């Protein structure tokens, strides 16, 4: 019975394009962002923000947390704009990647705290806006199953992303900086995919 209801939820998502588009938004961020969760730890171990690595890691995660919380507050007007709303999910993924690409290129000094803050502020907009849109577009009967699918896709993609980056580093295929750049490029690509394919359809819904 439970499995059938889950299956019915997936069919409902498949048959409803406005829901289907948005349910992948967090997973698109996580294609690169999943790896960045643990790459941030490795950055903290190399960056010199304190006498011990744990302090540097904590400071980086504090910047990440403040960014995730502040981004949606600052971006609230953007999320309400009919002109910007159709493309905002794509841009939020895109710019999250851009700032991690910058992190891969600059010296790991205090400046990366600002870059981490801005990147995760952008991804925070993605998380809040995608959740809000799913709530708005889904009837009560399906809301739990849609939300469950949303987080299933997110956590699965985070796992695949982290595993892939871990294997790349362990195998010595890329350096830490190069791996960070790769995850950033993946996010930029995912954001571009949303902007090219999803934004026009989102605009049609508003118009």
Kindly give the residue locations of the regions a language model identified.
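Residues at helix-coil transition
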Residues: 11-15, 33, 45-46
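Phosphate- and divalent-cation-binding pockets in alpha/beta enzyme and binding domains
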Residues: 23, 39, 113
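Conserved extracellular-gate-facing transmembrane-helix segments in secondary transporters
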Residues: 29-37, 158
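Contiguous, function-dense segments enriched for cysteine-driven chemistry
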Residues: 42
């Amino acid at each position: 019975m439970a499995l059938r209801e889950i299956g019915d939820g997936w069919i409902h998502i498949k048959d409803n394009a406005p829901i289907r588009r948005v349910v992948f938004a967090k997973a698109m961020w996580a294609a690169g962002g999943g790896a960045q969760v643990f790459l941030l730890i490795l950055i903290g171990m190399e960056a010199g923000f304190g006498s011990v690595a744990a302090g540097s890691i904590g400071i980086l995660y504090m910047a990440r947390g403040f960014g995730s919380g502040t981004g949606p507050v600052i971006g609230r007007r953007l999320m309400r704009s009919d002109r910007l709303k159709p493309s905002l999910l794509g841009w939020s993924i895109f710019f999250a990647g851009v700032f991690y690409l910058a992190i891969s290129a600059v010296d790991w000094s205090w400046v990366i705290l600002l870059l981490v803050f801005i990147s995760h502020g952008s991804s925070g907009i993605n998380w809040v806006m995608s959740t809000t849109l799913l709530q708005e577009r889904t009837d009560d009967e399906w809301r739990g199953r849609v939300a469950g699918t949303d987080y299933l896709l997110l956590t699965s993609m985070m796992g695949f992303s982290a595993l892939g980056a871990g294997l790349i580093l362990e195998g010595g295929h890329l350096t830490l900086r190069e791996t960070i750049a790769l995850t950033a490029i993946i996010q930029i690509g995912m954001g571009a995919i949303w902007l090219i394919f999803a934004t026009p359809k989102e605009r049609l819904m508003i118009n």
